[in-house]
Amino acid sequence: MLEYGIIEPAASPWASNVVLVKKKDGSLRFCVDYRRLNSITYKDSYPLPLIHNCLNALSDSSWYSTLDLRSGYYNIPIAESDRDKSAFITRQGCFRFMVMPFGLTCAPSVFQRLMDVVLCRLSYQACLVYLDDIIVFGKACNEQLTRLGEVFSR
């Protein structure tokens, strides 16, 4: 993460602990325990899509493509003045995120809002966005390909 500009060395009084969580495939997922930080963080109440609205939008389509914006949160920079709050401790030292990490209480709302802005005119008409997953849908193959192109061009 250091070499990709996701984290940087830090000296921060906010440092949280790292937790390694075992995934279904046996590999480990790097997580930071932000419970203390989250307990004092302003909660962003931006709404996530409702399932019945999603099902209604998809109901007339026959073609579907799913896109997973893997590491999508890492495309949202953290303000320099807030980076120390994202700090964590490892055996190699203290680091802080330069981009939005998973685990922050407001991260899902921030990301959903961004995706809704980026795909605003396509949402519920050509695609559905739920956090870092996008479903592009269409009634016919040509329509589906056109809609995929529209999503990719954003």
Enumerate the predicted regions with their spans.
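Retroelement reverse transcriptase polymerase core
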Residues: 1-154
